[in-house]
């Protein structure tokens, strides 16, 4: 990667979000994790920094508009204009509106810079499964597609019908945002692994 990207990850205390943060930070990106469970992400970010990565954590409650506004100011101070937004909200507990409110604040600079990525993570991968979430995600990414025409900004969904190892999801998110500008991985469908007897035994030994 020739240049570090400024990355925001929401609801960042989930296993998938933590794995994504670790992978992107290890690759040289500036990563800010937004979460209500700041103690988890602050400790995790400190471990990443001890290894030379640029990772930070800040309080973010997507159900509280003032918290979102404070988080955006914190992001501007710590990592600058956001290049990548990874939304792992799961769209539960009233977070849907807040997730869009945050996106509406960080997307305009991407459009101005004619480069950026917005990645939505399906609720199963984010550790939740609210009714109708898939339809909401499809509607959201469809709206973003229309907004991003000709701007150089891309919208993607990483989704699955079941649980997938967090590290694998982090790898796919990294691939989506690292694709050349001429490519757009709009939908990444992850097929959950088949739990064969041998694989089940290996997992029990871990």
Language model feature labels by segment:
Residues 111-112, 117-142, 146-149, 159-163:
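Catalytic loop of short-chain dehydrogenase/reductase
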Residues 5-6, 80-84, 97-99, 110-124, ...:
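Active-site loop of short-chain dehydrogenase/reductase
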Residues 103-104, 142:
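A short, exposed helix-loop element centered on a Lys and neighboring polar residues
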